[in-house]
């Protein structure tokens, strides 16, 4: 439905939306005569096409359903490690010590909730249809199996299963910046983390320094893989915006995932 007419120095970069990634739907944006997925080259003028690949759940989409999002970049706004360290000194990007090496490291929380021990969810196979446009509509226990910590602080990822987990750190994105999860690094492990890698300006900010935890979409590859509590699973790259947005991520936008802990997508009924 959409088309682009970009200035000569501005390119587009797409990702699945958070609610799309959290139901294990993988999307890729394609351009006319494009050589890469999810990228519109600077100056691109033409249509956009969307490849939609549900992995676990059958989904219902219709004309106008919003599955992906796009950002526009001019030049190279990504910060170096030195710039990220300076930004962290000005406004804490995570609670506790910041591990900055090729971006800001995020690690996995497998200790779980202090009261319940809940550490995440595993998607159930052969569950019902998900209408991507319906919010707070589905009983979570029909689609997800809760996973608890039984004292080992670890989790074995089964091959080709899909998990929702959370970062140990709480993250803040200053209003002047956005962030993106670095694409899968094979040195981290034999699994994929985070289909929807965009963190909007204001995410986790203004919450009395507490931030919001990153909810992670995790899929193992062909072999079982053991995750340990505190293991690094990805890194955030921060990018400076051309201007501060008039409206930030949060209450004013009715954002679904501000102040989030471990949270499923907006399609499910949650307490």
Show which residues each predicted segment covers.
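DUTPase catalytic domain/fold
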Residues: 1-271
